[in-house]
Amino acid sequence: MEQQWLSATLKSEDGDVYARFAYHLRDVLSDSQFSRAVWSQLEALPTADLDDYMRDLDELEDAVKCGMERIHGCTMLLVLTGAGYRDLVFALRDDAEAIEEAIQSLAAEHPNRLHTKVYQGPKFGPFEALVSRVAAT
């Protein structure tokens, strides 16, 4: 399957947020097997150089994405980049096991730079509206 990412700029009270949505995976939003969401917030290392800042976030995103996708049933759907952070939103299958332990292990590899929470709930947890909004832009 060819990867296709949609991009949008969302307005928020904290400023503009640049969003990327994995359009090629949009069917996950209506798949009843994906009823949990994993939200990971990444923090960049302090730097005065914008290129270094973005490179650092890109490298951390790649490491987290690879780590989460090694977990059975985790699929990255949405990336949000704002001032000083990048959030990754993953869909998680109901049958994924040991997710909390895997996340703790991944966070230990990146101390104080990765904050992750698993959300339970139907229709991709509380983020269905956000993911759908980005997908519709």
Predicted regions and their residues:
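Short, surface-exposed, polar/charged, turn-prone segments marking secondary-structure boundaries
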Residues: 40, 67-69, 106-107, 116-120
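Conserved short beta-strand edge segments in small beta-sheet-based binding/regulatory domains
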Residues: 108-137
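Short amphipathic alpha-helices in soluble, non-transmembrane regions
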Residues: 99-109
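Short Gly/Ser/Thr- and Asp/Glu-enriched loop/turn motifs at secondary-structure junctions
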Residues: 80-86
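Generic structural motif
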Residues: 76, 95, 114-118
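Short beta-strand->loop micro-motif that forms the acidic, two-metal-ion catalytic signature
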Residues: 88-90
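Charge-rich, low-complexity segments
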Residues: 1-65, 69-75, 83, 93-97, ...
